[in-house]
Swiss-Prot record:
Residues 1-164 form the PXA domain. Belongs to the sorting nexin family. Keywords: Coiled coil, Endosome, Membrane, Phosphoprotein, Protein transport, Transport. This is Sorting nexin-25. GO terms for molecular function: phosphatidylinositol binding. It is found in: Endosome membrane. May be involved in several stages of intracellular trafficking. It holds the Pfam family RGS. GO terms for cellular component: endosome; endosome membrane; intracellular membrane-bounded organelle. Residues 434-499 form a coiled coil. It is a peripheral membrane protein. One of its GO terms (biological process) is protein transport.
Amino acid sequence: MDKALKEVFDYSYRDYILSWYGNLSRDEGQLYHLLLEDFWEIARQLHHRLSHVDVVKVVCNDVVRTLLTHFCDLKAANARHEEQPRPFVLHACLRNSDDEVRFLQTCSRVLVFCLLPSKDVQSLSLRIMLAEILTTKVLKPVVELLSNPDYINQMLLAQLAYREQMNEHHKRAYTYAPSYEDFIKLINSNSDVEFLKQLRYQIVVEIIQATTISSFPQLKRHKGKETAAMKADLLRARNMKRYINQLTVAKKQCEKRIRILGGPAYDQQEDGALDEGEGPQSQKILQFEDILANTFYREHFGMYMERMDKRALISFWESVEHLKNANKNEIPQLVGEIYQNFFVESKEISVEKSLYKEIQQCLVGNKGIEVFYKIQEDVYETLKDRYYPSFIVSDLYEKLLIKEEEKHASQMISNKDEMGPRDEAGEEAVDDGTNQINEQASFAVNKLRELNEKLEYKRQALNSIQNAPKPDKKIVSKLKDEIILIEKERTDLQLHMARTDWWCENLGMWKASITSGEVTEENGEQLPCYFVMVSLQEVGGVETKNWTVPRRLSEFQNLHRKLSECVPSLKKVQLPSLSKLPFKSIDQKFMEKSKNQLNKFLQNLLSDERLCQSEALYAFLSPSPDYLKVIDVQGKKNSFSLSSFLERLPRDFFSHQEEETEEDSDLSDYGDDVDGRKDALAEPCFMLIGEIFELRGMFKWVRRTLIALVQVTFGRTINKQIRDTVSWIFSEQMLVYYINIFRDAFWPNGKLAPPTTIRSKEQSQETKQRAQQKLLENIPDMLQSLVGQQNARHGIIKIFNALQETRANKHLLYALMELLLIELCPELRVHLDQLKAGQV
């Protein structure tokens, strides 16, 4: 950074100061050092102020909303004839040229006052002179240039031509070697710095392009069902992530080799980077999966992570691996330890609130340990994407390879320390066998066993938490309450099972009759309700078991409808119905008549040899809670099987778990998102995309697709990806890149660029047509897939046309300039308010 800034200062001093000052004085050396000292002080002041700017907010919210307002105003001003056009209100400084200059002078004076060294600020004449130079020689010409549609069109053509050229280059970028390892060897053995710099650039371009490529169709996962095409999409996404990782490794190797050969140090502050001359020229690349699977490799990787102060990531991954292979009775203790070590005491593994709630649910036994698998997968991706590329170019990796070679020299590598990859096919076979066994067993017995296990788990968890150094009182209290609920749930299930057994054992011997009825009021509406007594009359006429259930008339009608779907003859049976006349109350006569009709209906059902076996009838007469009963007579026209009744209960029926409202839960590395939403930062971007491409009804779909794309491609929330992208855009490496572009534009090959020639209207018109044609020919496939081909085309034309009006461009530039300068120098706001007040 310092070197790049120094070059710009030297060129500026040579061409803008020394060119005239050298003829007036021979003391240019002293002036150079004085100005250089002031230059560095200005740079420090600028850096200090920029460090207090919330760059993510400015870029993602303020700038994007300014662009959104600009396009909305342009759209309103260009309304169709049948609509009322709205005048496009320009920035206040664009009323006339004098107001424009005054605005720039005000900005320049505040900038000079804020950034000049304290010793120079005292001089009023110096401040005025520098502000005038900044206004007339820098800001005004820059605004005129950037708002000129012809210049914009020329830049568009140049960038598109450059992109086509680079596309041709990168097609040949990886034809140097037949395999990835050979490509790495080629980098490590090459001694041409310029070749390596060009190769590094091509790799960076490839990384940028690769991260934007993904399959948009079928990104959404359907619960419990995946199509072959969906699996292919996920496979492509996984391979793309591996490809990006390989590119990142190649880039690191390229930078290391350039540094060894005396070229620029692209990554000077990389911890653990090899010193010059270290390491073999040809290096073996261990795959990340192999490093984690091998204890010896993982130990060295853990040492590197400790150096990076991220040892907790490896420790968490290892703890979850241990949890996967633990005995059932060890799980509560291990879960408690993981919770205490990583989420309570150190909090080194930061997760979103939704995942944290799942962890607490797992801790108390309401959910399985799958949440830890999910977090482990995200930690795995973080280790692979962020730390693996730098690890394999570190001194610790070099030492690992040396030790590995020594082992090979003395003996064959022992497999005892190897932790082989999990046999997924074997697991699936075991799962299939287990599922078959479970299907053959009685579901009710299995569910009772699950409740007993859950109860035991919660008791162990309670004991583990109570014995912890810092027991969480809320969780302890919650566990005690849940243990009471599970005990009650178990009692209900046992009673339900016993009652079901009685029913099955005595089919055809049950009787049901309505003993009484009453009128209840619900939501201001009168409803008839009946009390049905169900009894079992054994031989000898002695009633041994009975119970009473309240049922509304609507429930009788639902039972009639369900049974009629299976037995069409029941449709002829008429049940009582309420009068549809308004304000007609339910009288005693109706209650008596309906009671008799319903009694007859029940007796007919129970006396029928087939209908008395109906699951729907048993569920209607059973006093068990609704969550213990599932009725599904659809599609079972003439078949009734009470034995399968309990087996068709959903497996999570007895778990009172909080439903998560968010579907895109993932590891945010890392911190909660703004406003508790995973796309809060992207909201203005979504609105801008919707406005430019006129999505209307497609807006929600595009929003979900973008979130899914970022999740699949980068393995993180869109908020996290936006933060990382903005941080990368304004990183030191990219700032150096921008400064070098500025330097090369003003001083190509170290010489001041000649003034541009004035172009004719014909030339400008030809450039405009070529630029529009090129833009339409180069619409990214990703954009067309996202918003549709026609919408993409119309949106590109809208953007292009918006840039063809000089005054509209100036308006946007001044709006953005005011926004950014106020963020940099808040003092400017008062001066601009005074200026606007004086113009009114």
